[in-house]
Amino acid sequence: MQLSSTQPSSKTQEPSTAQDVITMQHILEKLYGANSISRQESQALFGAIIRGELEASQLAAALISMKVRGEHPDEIAGAATALLADAQPFPRPDYLFADIVGTGGDGTNSINISTASAFVAASCGLKIAKHGNRSVSSRSGSSDLLSAFGIKLDMSAQDSRQALDDLGVCFLFAPQYHLGFRHAMPVRQQLKTRTVFNVLGPLVNPARPPLALIGVYSPELVRPIAETLKVLGYQRAAVVHGGGMDEVAIHAPTQVAELNHGEIETYELTHRDFGLDTHPLSALQGGTPEENRDILASLLQGKGERAHAAAVAANVALLLRLFGQEDLRQNAQQALEVIHSGQAYQRVIALSARG
């Protein structure tokens, strides 16, 4: 089936519409009573949050209430819709493109697999608009690594779109597009625990990709986030958790929930499904942004560790499947050939030259 670049839905009722019918206090009272709220109510709540309209105590209570009960896909989708409605604009292309991103917070301090995978995927002919931020749990998040490579984080939306057109890859720095996040940051820092904001990052790419490979920090999130992507209108996506990592893993089985035109299938993948050798998690240990830069520079020039190449190849292979290349073994081999050729590193150099 030919894939189209149908835009995930983000144009729904404005948050104020919900507030005309149901007061913010009523929404908060529902949360305090351990009740779920509708997508419209969640959109209204998070619209108020990113406009700075909630007191710190109200915000903290709402976030903890949702966390203790467990966030529902409609609630997460409503929050994402509010953030996307408030995001700075990005000139969305009409061709097929994807994001590859993780929630972070898995605590493994691994190398930047999804960032390396974005460059390899672009060298395989895909278009990747990667949404990223500073580190959540490791010593080096995607944006930390890009800075170490000399890639501009504050590239304009138009220049980023041009890079996507020309190089097949661009990076969108979350704080540049989501200004309202700042209103929640003090409370999030005080709470010192994961909240719904930890899973929102991968769902609010301002380019609104129709395809996505999203890693989550807990296996319990795999199915709910896939359900959320369905609500948001994604065309095809895979949500993964592998052996404690927010990535496709080669050291342990990977749990997958794949969304394909409104249908969700759950399954498990191992290194054998990709025709790859297994490697221990310790072989993927990362370091500072500068150390990770050196590791990935070596990898993307075809001179890296076998474990690093295999980890990236597995993730690129599943990403290729989302574009319609269904054979994971062939996809992994294609990714390895690109890695060994050094083509991916040329894209790093080209992107860093776009000052």
UniProtKB/Swiss-Prot annotation:
Supply the enzyme class, top level. transferase
A Gene Ontology biological process term: L-tryptophan biosynthetic process
Cite the binding residues for Mg(2+) 1. Answer: 114, 247
Which GO MF terms does the UniProt record name?
Answer: anthranilate phosphoribosyltransferase activity; magnesium ion binding
Q: Which InterPro entries is this protein grouped with? A: Anthranilate_Pribosyl_Tfrase, Glycosyl_Trfase_fam3, Glycosyl_Trfase_fam3_N_dom, Glycosyl_Trfase_fam3_N_dom_sf, Nuc_phospho_transferase
Reply yes or no: does the keyword Cytoplasm apply.
no
TM ranges: none
The reactions it catalyses are: N-(5-phospho-beta-D-ribosyl)anthranilate + diphosphate = 5-phospho-alpha-D-ribose 1-diphosphate + anthranilate
* Cellular component aspect of the GO annotation: cytosol
Q: Which residues bind anthranilate 2?
A: 188
The source's superkingdom equals Bacteria
| Sequence positions that bind Mg(2+) 2 | 246-247
Pathway named in the protein's UniProt entry: Amino-acid biosynthesis; L-tryptophan biosynthesis; L-tryptophan from chorismate: step 2/5
In the record, the note on similarity to other proteins reads: Belongs to the anthranilate phosphoribosyltransferase family.
How this chain assembles, per its entry, is: Homodimer.
Annotated NCBIfam families: trpD
User: What's this protein's name?
Assistant: Anthranilate phosphoribosyltransferase
- State the gene name recorded for this protein: trpD
